[in-house]
Structure formats: C-alpha cells, structure tokens
Regions:
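Extended recognition/assembly regions associated with phosphoester-bond processing machinery
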Residues: 44-359
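Short hydrophobic transmembrane-like helices used for membrane targeting/insertion
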Residues: 1, 20, 35-37
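Compositionally biased, low-complexity intrinsically disordered regions
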Residues: 15, 30-32
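Basic polycationic patches enriched in arginine
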Residues: 18, 40-42, 52
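Cationic, low-complexity basic patches in intrinsically disordered or flexible, solvent-exposed regions
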Residues: 4, 8, 33
Length: 359
C-alpha cells in the first residue's frame, strides 16, 4: 500500500501525470483542502515536477471554483456538482439537462444471463434530488432515454412509462431530444412530454442541444454553446500494480463553425462552393459561430463508456469510433484539445495529453 508522505495546501494543481520512467500518480485538489501526493516523490522535487509537467505537456493549472463553468450572452452553463447533469441559466430561468438514461438496459443484460433489478427507482431518486437542489423550470432528456435501438422491448413498455409517469409528478415540463436508441419512444411517453426532432433544439438563441449521433439542425450552428451526449466519456486510471479505476468525465472542447457548417450542408444535400458559413447564412439565415461544445457523461452510471484517455488502438475499436457520431468524426469539434473534468470539478487536462500520459 502506498502511503501519503506530503501534504500541500493550494487552490488547484495538475491532477494526473506520468514520467517515462515512473508510475502514474493522481492528485486531488478540493478548494482549501490539502492535497495528498502518493508515491516516491521527494518534497523538494514537487514544484520542479509540476513545472516540468506543465512545460512538457502544455498543461494548465485550473481554478477549481470556475472549472467547467461557461458564461456568454447572459447564459450560464455549468455542471451540477458531483452529478452527471448540466444546469443552464438565462435571466432567472433554469433548465436541467441529462443524457443517456438507457432505461431497459437491464433487459439486454438478462439476455446475456446477467440479472440485475430495475434501475428506474434508483435513477428517479437520483434525479429527484438533483431537481430539488437546482429547481429548474424545464428538464431536457438529451437522447437515449431507452436502450433498445430500433424496437421496443416488452419490458420497456413497463420501465419507460413507469419512469415518465413518476417524473412528470416531480417536474411537469419535460422535453426529449431523441437519440439513436429512441426508436418508437413516443408511444411510451405521456402526451405532456414534448419530443423534439433528433437534430436538436435551441434555447435562448444561444444553447444548442443535440444527442450527437446525427448532425445538428442548421439553427444550432449559430449557438454559442453546443451540448451533446452519446459518447459516454470516461477516464481510466491505472496504478503501478495494474489496478484500474474508471471514472465518468465531462469534456469541453471548441467547435469549428466552418467545418460544422460544411457537414450540415452536406447532410442537407445543399450544393455550395467556397465558404460554408456564408452559404449557411444565405440558405438558413444563421450566422455560424465557433461554439463551446460540452460532451455530457451518461446519467445511468451503470453503463460502460468510451475511455477518452486511451488511444484508438488500445481503447477504441472501429465500432466505437463509429459510435462517436458524425460531428466528432468529422473533426468539427477539436476533441483532442478538449478539456476533461471529473464530477467534482477536478481538471484532468487535455484529452490528447491524457492519452500521452496513459501510454
């Protein structure tokens, strides 16, 4: 067992790093609490190590209080502390967003001989607590509400209506942006639940919400923020003895409005030459923006995820790359330079740096 040998108080620190000749170490840094450093580092080498890490990998030191919080046009976008939920605020109006519930996932496990009880009560209880804490006017389910892709499993006729019937008693205003698992979802939902098109919805002319399995609708190209699910991002930590810990994560990355516009135009079968942003403005009346893109973790924490700190050869099969969706595959979102955060606001670093550290 590795024992802590150094206590170091600070606002924030680099959290995960590996030198070529040394094992990986994990540092945690809640505000105004000590940081315990595990391993064989000497006290005198700590600051030098941090400096080398920062210079070698261009890693940034994050302000814990503001980690993951974005503000523009009177709109605030911030993860709910310690939860896989995103809170949007605009002039006193609050909207809560969650993604990837995958209700009925237990049925797939049962077909494989693994029997677990229904997760609907547990997910409802978790969501009820978040709703009580955040008090939103609207709840948006950002795709993959159910698990079966193109059909409705027999058990889903029980699980999904049961979930929604209980949900609308907690919060009456609920909207769904369908994902690739949400075929034939509408018959399972109450009439009061609004089901949007799968290419997304826009809030306050600033926030575009889409699941991520398909190109967003043209109006989303003008948003300052894009929010998507679908990927189920996780990070995998491994200690020197080979034990692995998997943690869900947020990813925040910049989108290239021009590339995104070109992809949407091709999806719309629109012929154009030259500047795609100009064509989008002419065809749809939308001024294309380079948005901040937030990739959400799955709300159902029993699901697996894509290890963003593994390279494609080790952690991502060709099938998983297909599951990334057209936006990420196209390079319209700079995923490699995206910033990864844990649920407590811990800044892990850029995705490409985390992959290099994991090699």
């Amino acid at each position: 067992m590795l024992e802590p040998f150094l206590e170091y108080s600070c606002q924030a620190l680099l959290l995960f790093f590996r030198e070529v000749s040394s094992p990986a170490y994990f540092l945690t840094c809640p505000l105004e609490y000590p940081v315990f450093v595990y391993g064989r580092w000497r006290t005198s080498s700590l600051l030098g190590w941090l400096l080398r890490a920062k210079n070698t990998f261009s890693l940034e030191i994050a302000d814990f209080e503001s980690a993951g919080i974005l503000v523009a046009d009177d709109v605030t976008v911030k993860p709910v502390a310690d939860q896989p939920a995103l809170l949007l605020e605009h002039k006193g109006e609050r909207v809560l967003v969650i993604a990837d519930l995958h209700l009925g996932w237990e049925v797939t496990l049962a077909h494989q001989g693994i029997h677990v009880p229904s997760q609907v009560p547990r997910l409802l209880d978790k969501l009820r607590k978040i709703l009580a804490e955040t008090n939103p006017k609207l709840l948006v389910l950002l795709g993959d509400v159910k698990h079966a892709v193109s059909k409705v499993e027999l058990e889903e006729w029980k699980y999904v209506p049961e979930f929604f019937d209980s949900l609308i008693e907690i919060i009456p205003d609920v909207e769904v942006v369908p994902g690739n698992h949400d075929g034939n979802l509408e018959p399972l939902t109450p009439s009061s639940v609004k089901i949007n098109k799968s290419n997304g919805m826009v809030l306050w002319d600033s926030v575009g919400l889409f699941h991520g399995h398909a190109w967003p609708a043209p109006p989303l190209l003008g948003c300052k923020f894009l929010v998507m699910g679908h990927l189920h991002p996780v990070v995998v930590f491994k200690d020197p003895l080979g034990f692995r810990i998997t943690r869900q994560a947020w990813v925040r990355a910049k989108s290239d409005g021009e590339k995104l516009a070109a992809g949407v135009l091709r999806r719309e079968d629109a012929k154009f030459e030259g500047d795609a942003a100009v064509e989008v403005k002419k065809k749809f009346g939308v001024s294309v923006a380079d948005a901040d893109c937030i990739i959400m973790p799955s709300f159902n924490d029993y699901l697996g995820g894509q290890p963003i700190n593994r390279n494609y050869q080790e952690g991502w099969t060709e099938l998983y790359k297909e599951y990334m969706g057209p936006v990420l595959r196209s390079g319209a979102v700079d995923f490699e330079n995206g910033e990864a955060y844990l649920f407590d606001g811990t800044f892990l670093g850029k995705v490409q740096d985390l992959r290099r550290l994991a090699q």
